[in-house]
Amino acid sequence: MIQATGAVCLIAFNFILYFLFGSVLTGGKGNRMSLTRTVFAGLFFYYLLFTIFCITVMLRWRPLHVLTSAWTFMMAVMSIAGMVRSRRCIIPAIKKASAFVSGNIAGFLLIGIITIVFISVILMSYQFTLDASYYVGNTAAAIRTDTINMYDPFTGDWLDHYEMRYFFATFSINDAVICSLLHVHPLIWCKITMAGTAIVLSVMILYMAGRKLFGTDMRKITVFIILAETADLFMITIYSTAAFLTTRTYEGKCLLANVVLPGILYIYICLLEDVKDRRTWLLLFLMALGAPVLSSSSNMLVPAMIAVTIIPLAVLRKDLWVIPKAAACMLPGIILTVIYIAYVKNMIVFYTYPTR
């Protein structure tokens, strides 16, 4: 019970980390700072930097504890940088957010209660899918063997080469690093902390979209979020994102389905207001870079989502510059897809041991 309570508290730890990483990018912008948007940007920046560190260590065949030490140092550096960057704008941003919350306390309380109920139902459920077990198994195997992606988490067999499907998707290895650092059991971290983090992030992106759609009308925003969460809880099928949010909550695909793809829709709404907003385009590009770390499915789905939502802006706003910008944001996923195809065709392979 004590461990479970601590795991719930670590959800706040994740959001603080995301905020500090995001502050490195968005800090110093005066009263323009948005707390939710900073967390959102920090999520992708965090995982993008992590996968750079992780792949560097993997290609040098170094153990997990080396990555843990290096990433701990990087987290400390980025946290300090985030605090320095946001020192002038964090207080005004908090005051602005607090004023809006206090003026709409009933709506936020209702959203909070429903979110807590949603989290409780999901965390107390028995998640038995094979894919979901992979994430805990890979995290536990990495910690137990002090290696990175060198053992099959289902069988325990040694792998002579890195599976390219998970080579860039280092989401579960980040779990292993944090579990090693904080001495948290992988099952507790994945099942409780990361599942709760995913649910809160999904509600946060709904709130961000609601603010863009309805402005400061908290009544409409509340109804919007309640309807979305109700749909997630009662419309669980293999064809909906709700399946990942309710039965495969601590998978990277859960964040892809319920944070990344809705996030691109949020970007689309922002660009409808101002198609030339450079910060919004940079955020979309950051998402395109960071999403493949969460799940390799991002390699195809993110470019497809961008093509469906963003490219039509060129017609709607009569701006041809939208097309090359959207293409640039699609490029990371396309490149990783080509690399995976080359791996499947035996054109490229990365071994788990020195070949020379």
Stretches with model-predicted labels:
Residues 261-280:
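Membrane-interface transmembrane helices that cradle and orient dolichyl/undecaprenyl
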Residues 115-231, 241-250, 259:
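Active-site lumenal/periplasmic loops and adjacent helix-entry segments of GT-C-fold
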Residues 1-99, 322-326, 334-356:
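Membrane-embedded, hydrophobic transmembrane alpha-helices
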Residues 58, 280-296:
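Membrane-interface alpha helices of multi-pass inner-membrane proteins
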Residues 103-130, 330-345:
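Transmembrane signal-anchor helices characteristic of membrane glycosylation enzymes that use polyprenol
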Residues 10-17, 45-51, 190-206, 301-308:
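Hydrophobic alpha-helical transmembrane segments
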Residues 13-17, 70-74, 197, 201, ...:
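Membrane-embedded alpha-helical segments of multi-pass membrane proteins
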Residues 302-330:
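Perimembrane helix-loop-helix junctions
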